[in-house]
């Protein structure tokens, strides 16, 4: 998912008339027509990420219920219907719930915006160094796992003042990674594991 979206955005960014010598960082919003293409690509990324996480939640919910169904059948020859309910209403409520005031869609949107900024910074560095789209794509894969490398290169290419502004805008908050990819992976794991525990807990109430 990240590789495909990265390649699309990098190819799009390479078509901009970005001038690193102005001291400004690359921004998709600097070109209105191409900005719409970037927005469409990011929207597709958000939808796919949401679908992956939602599918994982649903799969784990049913896995927990199937496990409990098996146990009930082993213990009782004719279990009551109420013991075999998969509580689909509770699943829908779980998917709609908010965490720290944000629902799943809003949290995915935040990850996508962080990813967009990550690509913009990578393009700023890559274009300033004359790197090809393929080179920048490889760089992005490294930065997604080691975001501090990206910040060091921003500092080296654009100076400490620009780095300071970037760091302020990019500060994700306590308990949040600087990497969109790492945040997406953690959110997926947390949501899917929570779905299993919630489904299991409801069955035993």
Give the positions of each predicted feature:
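N-terminal leader/targeting and assembly helices and adjacent pre-domain segments
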Residues: 1-174
